[in-house]
Amino acid sequence: MGEEGIKINDTHKRRIDEVEPSEKEDNVERQTKKYNFEIDEPEEQEKKDEKEDDKEESPSKSLEEISQSVSPVEEEPRDVRFKELSTPFSYPINDPPEGRPVRVYADGVFDLFHIGHMRQLEQAKKVFPNVHLIVGLPNDQLTHRLKGLTVMNDKERAEALRHCKWVDEVLENAPWVITPEFLEEHKIDFVAHDDIPYASDDSGDIYLPVKKVGKFIPTKRTEGVSTSDLITRIIRDYDQYVMRNLARGVNRKELNVSLFKKNELDLRHHIKVLRDTLRNHWVSTTRDLKADIKSFLSMATTDYQLQKNPLHGSSEPSSPGPTGFLGGINRWMQRRSSSHYDLPRVGNEIAASSSSATEENH
């Protein structure tokens, strides 16, 4: 650059009115060629200024809208993948390490392991291309003290997690609050959990220290599915489940049901069975009655057609009688009528035969 750079600097230090027009044009042309600047025409510059004014007047998005529109995972858990964050969250997110699997840690109680848990673990597994997913599980003593009673014990919950295909490692007796020492001990690169602040006795958000050091990856919750929701469904239909288990032979003491409650549920169960039986029999009886009426009407129509147009060589139409209830009544009536008219004829035949036998003897 040398002398030319010095000349340019000297020119810039001089007042504009002291520089000749030709000299100004030479300077501008020289700087344009050197730095490849694009000089806009006055009209184009005015258009750019108008666009910038429009951008300034347009309402800016709130931080909440920005955080919702930009997430490190996609909406659908099947296509979860890491995305570059053009707009950061309220906390930083570090770049993943290269040349080795990324060790991601996800913790929780995971009681009554359900689809919401599975989708959370799937997001954690797919947040980077190569992830080793570690799942932390607090023991029963810690969980019952800080969160409440669980349906499954810690061994059952750990075994359920081991059968999930997204999980590479289950860490039992995990701490309730993640500390830097814990991250260092297990060489954890990131912690994956939903972004809702999880309060404890000592902190408003137990994941806040992890967020501050850039090791927190937010996942999305599955709405409408939770362990509390499953328990609510069971409690809502409590009597039905108890009656079902009692009918299957489960002891009432195992169900924590008193003798009075058991007798009440037994009575309700018997009433329900009786009602269902009557309903089912009524349905079957109605179905048979409809079939008999249909058969009777079709037989009557056939008889009428045969009487109107008899077949050659047949004096009476042959048709199968009705079946079912009406068929039985019809056959019974036919037997009664035939026996009523046949008895005198049979008696006359017996009397005639006896008289002829007497005449022969004489």
UniProtKB/Swiss-Prot annotation:
A GO molecular-function annotation: choline-phosphate cytidylyltransferase activity
Leading EC class: transferase
Biased composition annotated in UniProt, kind: Low complexity: 313-323, 351-362
Residue spans crossing the bilayer: none
Phosphoserine modifications at: S315, S319, S355
UniProt feature, compositional bias: Basic and acidic residues: 1-37
Predominant localisation class: nucleus
Cell compartment(s), UniProt: Nucleus
Annotated CDD domains: CCT
Gene Ontology terms: cellular component: nuclear envelope; nucleus
Keywords, in A-Z order: Lipid biosynthesis, Lipid metabolism, Nucleotidyltransferase, Nucleus, Phospholipid biosynthesis, Phospholipid metabolism, Phosphoprotein, Transferase
Family per record: Belongs to the cytidylyltransferase family.
Protein name: Probable choline-phosphate cytidylyltransferase
Native species: Schizosaccharomyces pombe (strain 972 / ATCC 24843)
